[in-house]
Amino acid sequence: MKPPTRSQNRSDSQAASSQKDQKSNVENQTSLAPPPRPGAPTASDTPDYFNSMHNPFSLEPNPFEQSFGGNPADTPGKSLLPSVAALTSPALPGTSSASGYNWNNSLRSGPLSPAMLPGPTGPNDYFDSIGRGFPTPNESSLRTGLTPGGGGSMFPAPSPNSQALLQQLQNGGATPSTIDFHRTALAAKKNNSNAPTSNPNEQEQAAANMDVKPARPADFTQHDAADAANGLFMLAKGGQANNAPMNHAPMSNDTRAAARRVSQNTNGTSAEDASDHEPAKPAKGKGKKNTAKAPAANNRRKAEDAPKGSNKRSKSSMEMPSDMDDEDDEDDDMKQFPMDTKKMTDEEKRRNFLERNRVAALKCRQRKKQWLANLQNKVELFTSENDALTATVTQLREEIVNLKTLLLAHKDCPVSQAQGLGPLMMNGMSAGYDHHGYNMPPNMGMQPGGIPTQGMRR
């Protein structure tokens, strides 16, 4: 048997070493098994700061998953909002079936629906006078074909939704709502039959009744109910022309003038008729004559009504125009009403105002006098100072002339020749007094804004 070579021994040693390494690796693997996975954390376990598996928020239920996890179910018995078509024209068939609202008895489904009543057409709208504070008493809202901007009718061109309703009203078909409009208009006309107007018929009624005392016509404003009734009446007629002749007085822009004319027609006539049968009572204010003699002596009554302290007002009242006479007549008519407390209050206010004006004017005059006195004192002071300065300037000028004379007299002195003053005195002082003193060149004199010394002499 041959002995093993060196190469075989080397291979056997490598195989043995590899087997030992494998055994050591197996032993290490069996001895260093991975640690078991930690179980689920419980409430008693303290969460680790570096471990995200111990977060307790993962165990809390998510409210959003519970809310939105299932299928959405409608609320049983809920009502849907009406559609846009139902809101615009709820009277159309099929619009009220989608919602649970019943629009049959609503104001939006009748003749006053938004489709029939358009928006405002401008300042001359038909409903512009509703809610006004002081319209003309004889102004009526039952006008057809006279409304400015109405195009010959009360309403502009109707919309297609209300065309059928207008045709039905114009054909003469009286529906129950039309009958109600007629009844409302008649009732409103009956209630407003005794309203104060500017017609002369009420003057005869007031003259026939002697016991009626003049009262202030305060019911000039139209009631909202009457305006609504008149509007419904015109709406029920469907644009038909009004056959009843109506005499409308022109509307005056000055409401105060209208109120004055009405008060003269209603109260003035009744007061004159009552004064023929019973003596007139003296007024509580200043001594004024009765109303029967008032038209004949307007100027005399105005002179008596003027305050005693104001003579200028009484003189100027004799030359007032006719419109001022009307205002005085209105004031006399207003004095007949029980307004003594307010009138005395106004009189006291006027007196206080005049007193304040008098005190303010007195203080103003005193301040003006004081200011004038101070100004006069300042003028006198400045005048005396100016005279003193003028005298000083004159004295200095004379002294300068004397000094020049002395210098000219000593021009041949050896001291002046030694100092070189001889030619200087010959050039600058030989001509006597020079305008530019001290031998200054002409361009170096006083500036244009200055005051020359010769101009100070007075």
Swiss-Prot record:
Function statement: Transcription factor that positively regulates vegetative growth, reproduction, and osmotic stress response.
Chief location category: nucleus
Gene symbol of the encoding locus: Atf1
Record InterPro entries: bZIP (IPR004827), bZIP_sf (IPR046347), bZIP_transcription_factors (IPR051027), TF_Aft1_HRA (IPR021755), TF_Aft1_HRR (IPR021756), TF_Aft1_OSM (IPR020956)
Family in the record: Belongs to the bZIP family.
Name of protein: Transcription factor Atf1
Segments of this protein annotated with the region Basic motif: 349-378
Region Leucine-zipper, annotated ranges: 389-403
UniProt cross-references to Pfam families, sorted A to Z: Aft1_HRA, Aft1_HRR, Aft1_OSA, bZIP_1
Positions of the bZIP domain: 347-410
CDD domains: bZIP_ATF2
Disulfides per UniProt: none
Record-level GO cellular component terms: nucleus
Presence of the UniProt keyword Transcription regulation in the record: yes
Phenotype reported upon loss of the gene: Enhances the tolerance to oxidative, cell wall, and membrane stresses.
SMART domains xref list: BRLZ
GO molecular function, one term: DNA-binding transcription factor activity
Localization: Nucleus
UniProtKB keywords: DNA-binding, Nucleus, Transcription, Transcription regulation, Virulence
